[in-house]
């Protein structure tokens, strides 16, 4: 899935709809990202907005005043990973903006290494442009 998103980004596209519902896992075990149906329209300057998936949509997707970028998909990938390792859907971005109450992955599942939990928290920061910069380190 991450390789597919990397190819999208290399092509200058942003998915904006990454969530468990858009990830298929066929019998051979190779995960596939779906939900591309309206990607061209969403990136072509149309008024069509991407569907928002609570817990997986980045904060900037809820605001017409903020821009989306690669960091939008990074947030969603981290949210999907958070769900994968904890079994819980992350708190939605609007709820977190009111009161940042999301527990770390490590606090929900002690087998998740602290450093990995910190990477997920970093990628899911509420301030979009700085959301993924620290995660490169």
Say what each PLM segment does:
Residues 46-55:
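Activation loop
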Residues 55-137:
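C-terminal lobe helix-coil module of Hanks-type protein kinase domains
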Residues 1-13:
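Protein kinase catalytic-loop region centered on the HRD/HxD motif
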Residues 38-39:
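Activation segment
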Residues 22-35:
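Conserved protein kinase catalytic/activation segment
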Residues 16:
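Residue immediately N-terminal to the catalytic "proton-acceptor" Asp
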């Amino acid at each position: 899935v991450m390789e597919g998103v990397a190819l999208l980004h290399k092509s200058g596209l942003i998915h904006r709809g990454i969530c468990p519902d858009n990830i298929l896992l066929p019998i051979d075990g190779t995960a596939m990202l779906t939900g591309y149906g309206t990607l061209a329209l969403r990136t072509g300057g149309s008024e069509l907005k991407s569907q928002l998936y609570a817990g997986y949509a980045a904060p900037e997707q809820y605001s017409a005043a903020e821009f989306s970028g690669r960091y939008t998909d990074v947030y969603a990938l981290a949210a999907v990973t958070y769900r994968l390792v904890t079994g819980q859907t992350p708190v939605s971005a609007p709820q977190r903006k009111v009161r940042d109450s999301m527990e770390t992955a490590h606090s929900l599942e002690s087998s998740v290494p602290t450093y990995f939990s910190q990477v997920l928290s970093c990628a899911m920061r509420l301030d979009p442009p700085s959301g993924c910069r620290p995660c490169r380190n």
